[in-house]
Amino acid sequence: MARTIIAGNWKMNHGPRETREFVAGMKEKYQTPPAVETVICPPFVSISDLVNESPEWLKTGAQNVYFEESGAFTGEVSPKMLAELGVEYVIIGHSERRNIFAESDEEVNKKVRIALKYGIKPIICVGESDAQRNEGKTLEVVENQVKSALSEVVSDTLQNVVFAYEPVWAIGSGKAATGEDAEQVCKHIRSVISELNSSVADDIPVLYGGSVKPENLEEFMDQDNINGALVGGKSLVAETYCQLLEVARRFPGDEG
């Protein structure tokens, strides 16, 4: 059984001071671990504060990584640097990276492989655009993204991968997929993984992302193949993030 994860993607929000305030709010709410894998992915400048201030159960992620270990790559951050900071997760292939920064499937794959090399768990984002959805190509698009992301991934590291289904049309729009629609895609993601390695497919967390909030999280968590959520705006405030954790903890998964 896959573990339950609620991951927060802060995008370009919260500097060091706001990060420390968030952690203080989390520690005030939970004196003991909330029985859900909790991951926050802040901007690069706030990673050290999150690592240093957080209790052990509050995991730190990054929002991006470069696929080279070092060199003349102005503005980039290597997986070695992230690992040294204590980063445990990294979001790879988010639609904003793909669309705004023209990140290709090939680059996503390179980032996945080098993150795994350094022991960082990639949260691989896949999802269709509104046009692809209207053309009935959702499963085809997502399958191709999954296969490309996992190309040449060493089999004994596959269990460290996390997938997040984020329909592009739902991100930041206030429009979420239905639980049934998200389940159909997440089930397909798991079946594609099973074709590559059936022994780990059931243990890989598959998350839903796209206008997730405390009021609709239960609809997604109630599905057989959804193990949590990748959350944007509703993860910025400790109180709201804790509300998400309270919903998620009612759906037990593997404790990891």
UniProtKB/Swiss-Prot annotation:
Pathway field: Carbohydrate biosynthesis; gluconeogenesis; Carbohydrate degradation; glycolysis; D-glyceraldehyde 3-phosphate from glycerone phosphate: step 1/1
Binding site for substrate: N9, W10, K11, G172, S211, G232, G233
Keyword Metal-binding: no
Gene3D superfamilies per UniProt: Aldolase class I
Active site location: H94 (electrophile), E166 (proton acceptor)
Keyword set includes Isomerase: yes
Catalytic activity: D-glyceraldehyde 3-phosphate = dihydroxyacetone phosphate
EC number(s) recorded for this UniProt protein: 5.3.1.1
Keywords tagged on the record: Cytoplasm, Gluconeogenesis, Glycolysis, Isomerase
Transmembrane regions: none
Subcellular location, record wording: Cytoplasm
Chief location bin: cytoplasm
GO cellular component: cytosol
A single GO molecular function term of this UniProt record: triose-phosphate isomerase activity
UniProt-listed GO biological process terms: gluconeogenesis; glyceraldehyde-3-phosphate biosynthetic process; glycerol catabolic process; glycolytic process
NCBIfam families in UniProt: tim
Assembly notes: Homodimer.
Similarity comment text for this entry: Belongs to the triosephosphate isomerase family.
Function, in words: Involved in the gluconeogenesis. Catalyzes stereospecifically the conversion of dihydroxyacetone phosphate (DHAP) to D-glyceraldehyde-3-phosphate (G3P).
Protein's name according to its UniProt entry: Triosephosphate isomerase
Annotated source species: Natranaerobius thermophilus (strain ATCC BAA-1301 / DSM 18059 / JW/NM-WN-LF)
